[in-house]
Amino acid sequence: MEDSFLQSENVVMDADFMDGLLLDGCWLETTDGSEFLNIAPSTSSVSPFDPTSFMWSPTQDTSALCTSGVVSQMYGQDCVERSSLDEFQWNKRWWIGPGGGGSSVTERLVQAVEHIKDYTTARGSLIQLWVPVNRGGKRVLTTKEQPFSHDPLCQRLANYREISVNYHFSAEQDDSKALAGLPGRVFLGKLPEWTPDVRFFKSEEYPRVHHAQDCDVRGTLAIPVFEQGSKICLGVIEVVMTTEMVKLRPELESICRALQAVDLRSTELPIPPSLKGCDLSYKAALPEIRNLLRCACETHKLPLAQTWVSCQQQNKSGCRHNDENYIHCVSTIDDACYVGDPTVREFHEACSEHHLLKGQGVAGQAFLTNGPCFSSDVSNYKKSEYPLSHHANMYGLHGAVAIRLRCIHTGSADFVLEFFLPKDCDDLEEQRKMLNALSTIMAHVPRSLRTVTDKELEEESEVIEREEIVTPKIENASELHGNSPWNASLEEIQRSNNTSNPQNLGLVFDGGDKPNDGFGLKRGFDYTMDSNVNESSTFSSGGFSMMAEKKRTKADKTITLDVLRQYFAGSLKDAAKNIGVCPTTLKRICRQHGIQRWPSRKIKKVGHSLQKIQRVIDSVQGVSGPLPIGSFYANFPNLVSQSQEPSQQAKTTPPPPPPVQLAKSPVSSYSHSSNSSQCCSSETQLNSGATTDPPSTDVGGALKKTSSEIELQSSSLDETILTLSSLENIPQGTNLLSSQDDDFLRIKVSYGEEKIRLRMRNSRRLRDLLWEIGKRFSIEDMSRYDLKYLDEDNEWVLLTCDEDVEECVDVCRTTPSHTIKLLLQASSHHFPERSSATEYSLWH
């Protein structure tokens, strides 16, 4: 008797436990291979797990939907699809709905709309439901006779609701001719879509765009709705606002909470344990990447630079994830981005919220190739091609370039670095120059990163083909990956810019001639096909820095001192062009040979001093004519050329060649590089009688001779100045430089958008100049900044020492305004592993 009492008590306790367990609903799943729908007959009349006994069993739920008035049409096909597609899963798993009075999906959708109205943070919004129905033998989405809600005080939303009722969109995957519209894309893709302003849509993307403009509606969010545990899309909830919707997360979270309240859901799913990565070693490269992006933005005034990586790699969840696309989804690394322009910070936040699929935008395209991807205007993309195109349009961003790099720590973690060009850089020629400058930044690629080789790209393509992965389709897009590099000329870019596919703008990184060659990075994004191979650096699987160093070493060995001497007469820039290297490389080679300054650069400094003396002499009345001091400077190249020619003749085989007639080069054509080295080429002409010196005459001798003559002339001029200064009766009203002008410098400094003017004593010390400027701009540590001056050729030249300041003053004294124009920028010298080989291009 006691046993039966205890037994009945245990039954009551078990029933209470089960009631509590099933109160909110749960899943049952078999583990021994059996199936719920194939349960063996039981001796009892009713099975304890009879599917018909559950309030929200799949069969019962869908049958109720299919017989519910107008809404019955929207699930007629889904009932069949669910029984066929999910049959195996439903046999293994079963959903037990929560206790209490059951409600159909239709009722819950109505409740969801009411909940969204209460949960949403937006005021002045229209909430409407789009559901699939059968119409004319086709499945279409409609909002007619479906639940909706809007602000009763806003007539614009009421008008837009009446307009939306008259629209329907295709709900069939194979119906390519019909317009899907925003609700159709969300329903078919099972992914949410949002825009800060629907007015940015094209009419083929959003057929209601003209009505939206008339009704003055802005931000729009559309999300798919699912049942718990099901992948069948029940419909689409669209939220239309009268204000711009910049941030997605607040509204999305509100809608998701409203759906969960009625046991529905949207697309945001927890990361499946099987897809969670455990290798976070890629984070070791993030500090170097951050520094790389910072240097690029501060050097070239870029508004934004971002780092993209796969969501799977960083275990990141998002609203655009589902089981099918998770491995193709990419997102930004929030702590590896740099915002150079505070006005685009919200755009960066939107990028962080809105993940991309590989193939979307320049960043998504870069994941599918091993070269850079460039677009002259990302705001021209369709929404399906680049979901953030409307945000780019809103914040005035146009040009963008991205390149894919691989982490050597893991061998599989890929980063895509995305750079947005300045907002005012919208001209194609300006963009080309900016890309040319940005390409030099890639010479600073950290040693922990490398590019993807062609072989690795081929292997990835084979895997994609085997798995039959479908990436977002981009109409008329060029092939994004393959063995052939994607190159385009400037004319092709201009033609492509007139189309709606800015992704056709060419890639300029090209592979090697052989399959095993490294991956070439050309000096600058050169759109011409005749790039000089000597001006290229090489990426390889071992990292850019190592290969670039090997290539530099090989090039340096082939340029001897004798080769350099042949070009001493001209400018350093001309010499670099003739030799086939960049000016910075030539300067490094000169330093290896003990040449600290290009010879004509030295003589030019002396020329500036002589010109200053000449001005002083000319300003004194009573002096009969100027002294001919300019002839020494002008004749310097002739002296070198005269010594150079016999040396060349001695090396040639008989008979000796006829005298060479050199063409005239522009007079005093100056060129300044980033480290303040300057070159000049003066007017030269070599006649037939200029080769009379013996062949043994050395170029160094000519240099010494010229230098001695100049020193002698300078010495005599100094004596003349001393004599003139000792005169007691100098006529009044002379143009002699006043002591005030001699003691003070007029300086104009630009720092970003700020400009200051100042006068300071002529100490000609760089330290004093930096201190004075730092005091005006309230900068404590001036070592983190670079200071440049504008020379007579309108080029910015870096000030690095007191000698540079002296030359800067001498040069600026020759200008009519006698004002020194300076530019203050964030220094790139704090950049790790910066090589002198890229200094010139960085400031070019």
UniProtKB/Swiss-Prot annotation:
Primary localisation category: nucleus
Q: Which CDD domains match?
A: PB1_NLP
Q: List the biased-composition ranges (Low complexity).
A: 661-682
Tell where it localizes.
Answer: Nucleus
Report the record's disulfide bonds: none
* InterPro entries the record matches: NLP (IPR045012), NLP1-9_GAF (IPR055081), PB1-like (IPR053793), PB1_dom (IPR000270), PB1_NLP (IPR034891), RWP-RK_dom (IPR003035)
GO BP annotations listed: response to nitrate
Q: Which residues form the PB1 domain?
A: 744-827
Domain of life of the native organism = Eukaryota
Compositionally biased intervals (Polar residues): 683-695
Q: From the UniProt record, which GO molecular function terms apply?
A: DNA binding; DNA-binding transcription factor activity
- Cite the entry's keywords alphabetically: DNA-binding, Nucleus, Transcription, Transcription regulation
Q: Which Gene3D superfamilies does this chain map to? A: Phosphatidylinositol 3-kinase Catalytic Subunit, Chain A, domain 1
List GO terms (cellular component aspect): nucleus
Q: Where is this region: Disordered?
A: 641-709
RWP-RK domain span:
540-626
Q: What does this protein do, in the record's words?
A: Probable transcription factor.
**Record PANTHER family:** PROTEIN NLP4, PROTEIN NLP8
The protein's name is Protein NLP4
